From Swiss-Prot:
Stated name of the protein: Small ribosomal subunit protein eS4
InterPro entries with a match to the protein in the record: Rib_uL2_dom2, Ribosomal_eS4, Ribosomal_eS4_central_region, Ribosomal_eS4_central_sf, Ribosomal_eS4_KOW, Ribosomal_eS4_N, S4_RNA-bd, S4_RNA-bd_sf
Similarity comment text for this entry: Belongs to the eukaryotic ribosomal protein eS4 family.
GO MF: rRNA binding; structural constituent of ribosome
UniProt keyword annotations, A-Z: Ribonucleoprotein, Ribosomal protein, RNA-binding, rRNA-binding
Cross-referenced CDD domains: KOW_RPS4, S4
Gene name for this UniProt entry: rps4e
Organism: Aeropyrum pernix (strain ATCC 700893 / DSM 11879 / JCM 9820 / NBRC 100138 / K1)
PROSITE patterns xrefs: S4
GO BP terms: translation
GO CC, alphabetical: cytosolic small ribosomal subunit
Ligase listed as a keyword: no
Pfam families listed in its UniProt record: Ribosomal_S4e, RS4NT, S4
Sequence ranges assigned to domain S4 RNA-binding in this UniProt record: 43-114
Amino acid sequence: MARMGGQRRLKALAAPRFWPILRKEYKWAVKPRPGPHPAEKSLPLLLIVRNVLGYAQTAREARKLISEGHFRVDGVVRKDYKFPVGFMDVIEVVDTGEKFRMLPYPVKFFKLHPIPEEEGDLKPVRIENKTTVKGGHVQLNLHDGRNILVRVKDPRNPVEDVYRTMDTLLITVPGQEIKGHIKFGEGAIAIIVGGRNVGRVGVVKSVQKGWGRKRTLVTLEDASGNLFQTSLDYVFVIGLDRPVISLPEGAWK
């Protein structure tokens, strides 16, 4: 009989290149569970605990710590060691109070960046698309799988819907209360979340529209005045006058 569904296991050699694992030492790697982020843009919680934070030496130790509820992701205790952690997620070590944000980073693709206490319950999320639901209300579909409902009084004139695709919302986690709205456009500060310019931060200078998001070209200028280009699909706006989140030293002015 033919196999139905996907593989439940993942070979280390087939894991994404940016995963911090010893591919030639171990045959198998932890396969992320389906969740808010795709496997090619996330790290399983076990790898973060063991390989990045160094709180465990073995997978068994990491699974034990996770199952005991020592780690929160976006304000929620996660006990599944396969839970996928991706861009902009906030990881908290419950016992120490340490908080980190998962940021895109050059070459390594991901970096756990320490953040201050006041930033720990805030998260920027990108609007991927919008849908109209029953009653004429607008549902915002975000990059991490979340949905936020914008209620409108008159579906024929939805003045409450001021949001556009590719805009960024600053929300609380886990409450999902909207605290800020950053519009995508020229003059906005953005961080690149994919491609060869991953992790670079710059100001949007121009947008050359193409067929679809991936073929639309965005030109940005970094803090040193250097211009670079990338696909619109990789652009994640994080501020107007200044970034709304803390960044690694040297990433911005």
